[in-house]
């Protein structure tokens, strides 16, 4: 227990009402957030002589201050707790690493509705189907729908400005509502209705309606139409036969858990309208000494009560663990959703099968993750031994990419004890240097990255400079001149140059820009982690450079036209669907773009043609 914090005096001031408490360390950092039905009773439990776990002992030893927020109800306390956890990311709380909103398929409310992927708040008028586990699942479904039900997926800006149908119409993947006369309003509306029914899990209704239309077309001797509908029926049947279908109308999330070697995996199976839309594994950050019950309870609360998750609640949640606050969670979710949400922990029949499947997937994903972590841990340990460091908790690597000196981009990738930290990868656009001067580019990116205050936990143990002696000399010069509040001598600067014939395994490493470097055996685990982070940095730089080059390619032609500034360039490209669409447009079509006069449209047309 802290010598400064007076627990007895503090507890005398605490109420017995429900609420949330925040614990701070000597640096004023929130280290733990908790909720309680009775704040006095809960907080008193931290200062007993016999504490429940080593984790609690370590937590209490660091407490310097506690803030309390009283709430009207337990539900308010539960919501506030998870908002604080998301805000402060306390080190002693179980943390959900990925709380991005899930993607949906969006069917717009336009005159000619379009299909698209959507994330975030649902402001646009239309219908939302999902959620799907990731963007790939949505894109795959959209591609499938486009083959079966050819309704448009183009942006409204493209749709409104077309005078002739696009390639999607030519290959039979869109009915072409953008051009009058290509499809009747009734036919387009019918295909939209099929999509609506299909995404709602009502495949039988789609097939029934299609079969009726096919039979009518045959009776009317419209054999080509009947054959087209027959092909559509076969496509729908092929899709529905492949789907794992549960009881009709099931709308639930199934959550399985695995826990081993201090790591937890929570696997979520998404079932909507009786169909398994997909699944996803999560690996929450678990402080040492945490019990499985706390992992599950905190994960479920953060998963559903933080951010946009509360807008995607299913009717039922199946859990692989009996929560102590199950009733409170169900009541809170029901209150948020405005409808009844059931939380079930001991299902039977098909639901028990779902839970077993989720549990098996969690165990499999955890085994894979532990294996990967073991490998990266071994490699980092080997590298620490080579570099004579006690441990490597964080590494950063830099690379430069450009084309003939143009569109220079620097990348920074970050590894921790578990491998790549992709959320912390960064790209830097380099400007104000002589084209092709990689040394100046490295100098600039290092000053931008490290010439400011950095949190203690974000200071790297090793900074890897891809490029050899010259680049390492730049790094040394930058760090010698840094005037920063953090310990600039802590990171070890390591240069890496490609060896003979630029082959992997022949890399030369440098501690100093002068003198000879040294090599590691091709099968060295230390070399493997260096190759891994260097390749990640190279790929990240190349990716950023390609995006920048593509952007310049799309705008450079327009930049030479007098009267077309950045805003007009952006508007032209947006409304025409890119530079190619603009090249193919007529003067009249260009003049329809907001802010473009007839005279300017003619100038743009002739500039692009000649």
Curated annotation (Swiss-Prot):
GO terms for cellular component: cytoplasm; excinuclease repair complex. Residues 16-94 form the GIY-YIG domain. GO terms for biological process: nucleotide-excision repair; SOS response. Keywords: Cytoplasm, DNA damage, DNA excision, DNA repair, Excision nuclease, SOS response. Residues 204-239 form the UVR domain. Transmembrane segments: none annotated. CDD domains: GIY-YIG_UvrC_Cho (cd10434). One of its GO terms (molecular function) is excinuclease ABC activity. Gene3D superfamilies: 5' to 3' exonuclease, C-terminal subdomain, GIY-YIG endonuclease, UVR domain, UvrC, RNAse H endonuclease domain. It is found in: Cytoplasm. The keyword Cytoplasm applies. Its main location: cytoplasm. InterPro entries: GIY-YIG_endonuc, GIY-YIG_endonuc_sf, GIY-YIG_UvrC_Cho, Hlx-hairpin-Hlx_DNA-bd_motif, RuvA_2-like, UVR_dom, UVR_dom_sf, UvrABC_protein_C. Interacts with UvrB in an incision complex. The UvrABC repair system catalyzes the recognition and processing of DNA lesions. UvrC both incises the 5' and 3' sides of the lesion. The N-terminal half is responsible for the 3' incision and the C-terminal half is responsible for the 5' incision. Belongs to the UvrC family. HAMAP family: UvrC. This is UvrABC system protein C. It comes from Salmonella gallinarum (strain 287/91 / NCTC 13346).
């Amino acid at each position: 227990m802290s010598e400064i914090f007076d627990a007895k005096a503090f507890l005398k001031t605490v109420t017995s009402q429900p609420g949330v408490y925040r614990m701070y360390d000597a640096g004023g950092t929130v280290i733990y957030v908790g909720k309680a039905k009775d704040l006095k009773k809960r907080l008193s439990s931290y200062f007993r002589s016999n504490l429940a776990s080593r984790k609690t002992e370590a937590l209490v030893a660091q407490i310097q201050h506690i803030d309390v927020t009283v709430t009207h109800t337990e539900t308010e306390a539960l919501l506030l707790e998870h908002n604080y956890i998301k805000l402060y990311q306390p080190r002693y709380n179980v943390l959900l690493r990925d709380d991005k909103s899930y993607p949906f398929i969006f069917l717009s409310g336009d005159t000619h509705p379009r299909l698209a992927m959507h994330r975030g708040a649902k402001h646009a008028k239309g219908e939302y189907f999902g959620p799907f586990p990731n963007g790939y699942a949505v894109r795959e479904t959209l591609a499938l729908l486009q083959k079966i039900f050819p309704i448009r997926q183009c942006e409204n800006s493209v749709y409104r400005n077309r005078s002739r149908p696009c390639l999607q119409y030519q290959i039979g993947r869109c009915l072409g509502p953008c051009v009058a006369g290509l499809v009747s309003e009734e036919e387009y509306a019918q295909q939209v209705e099929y999509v609506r029914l299909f995404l709602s899990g009502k495949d039988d209704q789609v097939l029934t309606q299609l079969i009726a239309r096919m039979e009518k077309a045959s009776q009317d001797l419209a054999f080509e139409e009947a054959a087209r509908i027959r092909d559509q029926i076969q496509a729908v049947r092929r899709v529905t036969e492949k789907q794992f279908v549960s009881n009709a109308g099931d709308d639930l999330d199934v959550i399985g858990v695995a826990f081993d070697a201090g790591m937890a995996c929570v696997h979520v199976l998404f079932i909507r309208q009786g169909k398994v839309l997909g699944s996803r594994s999560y690996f929450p950050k678990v402080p040492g000494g945490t019990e499985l019950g706390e992992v599950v309870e905190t994960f479920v609360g953060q998963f559903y009560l933080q951010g946009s998750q509360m807008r995607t609640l299913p009717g039922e949640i199946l859990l692989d663990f009996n929560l102590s606050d199950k009733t409170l969670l169900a009541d809170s979710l029901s209150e948020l959703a405005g409808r009844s949400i059931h939380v079930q922990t001991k299902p039977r029949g098909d639901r028990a099968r779902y839970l077993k499947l989720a549990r098996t997937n969690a165990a499999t994903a955890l085994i894979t993750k532990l294996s990967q972590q073991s490998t990266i841990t071994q490699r980092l340990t080997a590298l620490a031994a080579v570099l004579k460091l006690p441990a490597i908790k964080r590494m950063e690597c830099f690379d430069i990419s450009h084309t003939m000196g143009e569109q220079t981009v620097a990348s920074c990738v970050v590894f921790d004890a578990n491998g790549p930290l992709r959320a912390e990868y960064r790209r830097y656009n380099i400007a104000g240097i002589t084209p092709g001067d990689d040394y100046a580019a490295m100098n600039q990116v290092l000053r931008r990255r490290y010439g400011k205050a950095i949190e203690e936990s974000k200071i790297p143990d090793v900074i890897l400079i891809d490029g050899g002696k010259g680049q390492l000399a730049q790094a040394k010069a930058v760090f010698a001149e840094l005037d920063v509040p953090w310990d600039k001598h802590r990171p070890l600067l390591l240069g890496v140059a490609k060896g003979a014939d630029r082959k992997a395994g022949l890399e030369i490493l440098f501690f100093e820009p002068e003198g000879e470097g040294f090599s590691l055996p091709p099968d060295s685990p230390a070399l493997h982690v260096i190759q891994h982070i260097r390749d990640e940095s190279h790929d990240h730089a190349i990716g950023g450079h390609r995006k920048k080059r593509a952007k310049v390619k799309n705008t450079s032609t327009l930049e030479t036209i007098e009267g077309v500034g950045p805003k007009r360039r952006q508007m032209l490209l947006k409304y025409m669907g890119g530079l190619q669409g603009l090249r193919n447009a007529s003067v009249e079509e260009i003049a329809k773009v907001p802010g473009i006069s007839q005279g300017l449209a003619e100038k743009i047309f002739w500039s692009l043609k000649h």
